[in-house]
Amino acid sequence: DEWFPYWRNFCMDWIVKLGGNPENLRFRDHEKEELSFYSKGTTDIEYKFPWGWGEVWGIADRTDYDLTQHQNTSGKDMSYLDPITNEKYIPYVVEPAVGVERLFFMFFTDAYDEETLENGETRVVMRFNPVLAPVKAAILPLRKKYAEKAEEIRHELSYDFAVTYDEAGSIGKRYRRQDEVGTPFCITIDEQTMEDGTVTIRYRDSMEQERMTVEEVRNKICKEIRF
């Protein structure tokens, strides 16, 4: 009985750690009349979609039904001998069944944000957990004359995570483009980069910036995208 609640909690924690909003999530235990004939208990993790609550993950306690049926059909003994208690039994199966498309839609829905800035402008941001962001960092040369150095840094960082390069338009417009697609980090190459090798890293969610070496940037981003 302990493994069914374990997997219920494991699946919920997994969603939340990857950016699912706990306020939009809930457990729903199936009523007795809803249960499949093989199930001792089934719980759905439901998400509050724009149109209402819907299942994103189902966890079912299938008891020993699956292995018993396999044993009866194949003639192969599916029992397990506990080396400590010397007890022999057919193991129970807990089945967490999830649809990838629903999960993606859930994460997209939770990540989307329209933020009103101090100047009255609206900033569209996809606040993906860095682990899920398709592109982890954007390399942005402040001027085109820094393009060669920027490309060198892009190439260096691309060994560790997905990096994009953008030199079109003002730096502000480039920040906004990266915010809209959910890139968590922007790395700006400027005159000081040419002098001492440091770059500016800008954080998508807070828009705050820090100055550091490329190696420090690499270590910081690698830490943020580790799961």
Task: Tell me what each language-model feature is.
Residues D1-F227:
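NTP/phosphate- and nucleic-acid-binding module
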